[in-house]
Design a protein with these regions (language model features):
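Glycine-rich cofactor phosphate-binding loops and adjacent beta1-alpha1 units
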Residues: 20, 70-149
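Short gly/pro/ser/thr-enriched loop/turn and capping motifs at secondary-structure boundaries
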Residues: 1, 59-61, 124-127, 156-157
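C-terminal substrate-binding/catalytic core of Rossmann-like NAD(P)-dependent dehydrogenases/reductases
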Residues: 84, 88, 131-190
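Mid-domain Rossmann-like dinucleotide-binding core that forms the NAD(H)/NADP(H) cofactor-binding site
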Residues: 2-77, 81-82
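The conserved SAM/SAH-binding core of class I Rossmann-like methyltransferase domains
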Residues: 54, 120, 194
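C-terminal capping/lid region of NAD(P)-dependent oxidoreductase domains
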Residues: 118, 127-128, 181-193, 200-221
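A general structural signal for well-ordered alpha-helical segments in protein cores
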Residues: 10-13, 104, 172-176
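Structural detector of well-ordered beta-strand residues that form the stable sheet scaffold
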Residues: 29, 52, 116-118, 149, ...
């Protein structure tokens, strides 16, 4: 039962897989290894990809490894070279889970020709860059012809429908099955189990002490 609350976050993470072209044997990088990024990385691995998790936080990288992510890379300077070395030149899919526009733009160079960038984290904050250069990475064959995709979960219907393969309900059912079988690992992500009266402290920790607070559960009884 303590694992059930993670279903909601894992369903969000699954959206990135549903819109991707990830297949067995592909290389996938995930930028941002918070709850959603961690689970997106795990799901990509379950789909048969070699996954590279990227984060500035050593603690989050350590948690990703505890959840079965075989390759982790420190974000920042030198990350591009390390990712490309693991991915034999570039990843086929990059899942951007931080929501930081600068990270999305700078990680385009990590992607191989005809690869894809999946925006899982909702972009926020102002960021100025050379848009022409970015658009050329999408448009020009010599620059990669990279495909950008949005992974906002509400692109899918809530209820199951015989004419639509994916839905939020179906994704949740899949997640339940993965949690039950132990294939999706979330136990290492539980950092705190708190009383409801400690909600303010929990939200403060999640906002301001992200290395200490990952998955916070409330004990209601």
């Amino acid at each position: 039962l303590p694992l059930v609350p993670f279903t909601r976050m894992a369903t969000v993470a699954m959206t990135s897989l549903r819109v991707s072209t990830i297949e067995l044997g592909d290389h996938v990088a995930v930028t941002g290894l918070g709850l959603i990024g961690n689970m997106a990385a795990q799901l990509a691995g379950l789909q048969g990809a070699t996954v590279i998790g990227v984060d500035l936080s050593e603690n989050r990288r350590r948690l990703a490894e505890a959840c079965g992510i075989s390759h982790t890379v420190a974000g920042g300077e030198g990350a591009a070279e390390r990712v490309k070395a693991i991915a034999e030149g570039g990843v086929g899919t990059l899942i951007e889970a931080t929501g930081v526009p600068q990270v999305a733009v700078e990680s385009v160079s990590w992607i191989r020709q005809y690869g894809e960038l999946i925006l899982l984290g909702s972009p926020r904050g102002r960021y100025e860059t050379d848009v022409t250069d970015l658009l050329n990475s999408v448009h020009l064959n010599g620059r990669g012809c990279i495909t950008f995709k949005g992974a906002h979960e509400w692109r899918f219907p809530v209820e199951e429908d015989p004419f639509v393969k994916h839905s939020l309900v179906r994704n949740s059912k899949v997640v339940f099955g993965l949690l039950k079988s132990g294939r999706l690992r979330v136990e290492p992500l539980i950092s705190h189990i708190l009383a409801p009266e400690e909600a303010a402290a929990a939200y403060d920790g999640l906002k301001n002490r992200k290395d200490e607070y990952q998955g916070v559960l409330f004990k209601w009884v």
